[in-house]
Amino acid sequence: MTSRNYLLLTPGPLTTSRTVKEAMLFDSCTWDDDYNIGVVEQIRQQLTELATASEGYTSVLLQGSGSYAVEAVLGSALGPQDKVLIVSNGAYGARMVEMAGLMGIAHHAYDCGEVARPDVQAIDAILNADPTISHIAMVHSETTTGMLNPIDEVGTLAHRYGKTYIVDAMSSFGGIPMDIAALHIDYLISSANKCIQGVPGFAFVIAREQKLAACKGRSRSLSLDLYAQWRCMEDNHGKWRFTSPTHTVLAFAQALKELAKEGGVAARHQRYQQNQRSLVAGMRALGFNTLLDDELHSPIITAFYSPEDPQYRFSEFYRRLKEQGFVIYPGKVSQSDCFRIGNIGEVYAADITALLTAIRTAMYWTK
């Protein structure tokens, strides 16, 4: 391990501000009102307000990574007679399928392939053919490829068919404007270390209270019981059932302040979009091609085809970039040789320009 700090060009954990890091220098007592009422309850309220201005929603914080919250929702929201349609076009949709299988939850997996956007007409046909489906679950920003999925159109279907709608917005909430009530979302799942630009340690669920109240006694897990976590926070003014990740929570509270100072989600989205467009233009000028067509891209992360030169090795390319202070992501696409570059976190236009210069220097196979 080196003491040198790198610019993380990843979908999270990501580069955070100095002030977010400094917020973790304070030690909090998990029983103290200053922490539970003054910090946790404020975060819950702010998250709900970021998600929608409509009444009837609440926020629940849960220890662990984003996948813990996804599993908590699936394991708590679906009863023994329920069935979920899981829309999958990448590793994170596939992870939901795996979770449902391990928990014994009835499910229909619609997998449209990693480089295709889900076909809304195909989803319509599945719902029409199988009235036993009670829930729909899908990923918004699929970071396997950088695909942005059509949660608005699928939400319209969920509303029309009367289905409970679960959206994994891990790498989009806080970075892409949305109104979850208008999108007919019943459960939105995200994480502290993504677009709000906090650090890892907890995830959160923003849910329709009426749906959440119906989850009592359903959970397949003690620790991941979403209803029990919600009731504990409601009844005890922000207290967590089990040990709260206090330092991460303080960092997140600071990150929310910095999101507001930047101008809110709309301003952050604009920065992310400009970062991504500048990155793609610069990479194409260097001879790299994107895995996806431009209209399919999210402003979060972009997958690029690896060079076909026989001398190219991702490990060597990565090492040379890291020496210059930049960390990128390996590929996760099963059918294509790719690498990925994220552009969220404390990343600005000057950073993208510096990255492109570093990439040019690191292209040893062209020398």
Curated annotation (Swiss-Prot):
Its EC number is 2.6.1.37. GO terms for biological process: organic phosphonate catabolic process. Its cofactor is pyridoxal 5'-phosphate. It catalyses: (2-aminoethyl)phosphonate + pyruvate = phosphonoacetaldehyde + L-alanine. The keyword Cell inner membrane does not apply. One of its GO terms (molecular function) is 2-aminoethylphosphonate-pyruvate transaminase activity. The keyword Transferase applies. Keywords: Aminotransferase, Pyridoxal phosphate, Pyruvate, Transferase. The modification N6-(pyridoxal phosphate)lysine is found at K194. Involved in phosphonate degradation. Belongs to the class-V pyridoxal-phosphate-dependent aminotransferase family. PhnW subfamily. Homodimer. This is 2-aminoethylphosphonate--pyruvate transaminase. It comes from Salmonella dublin (strain CT_02021853).
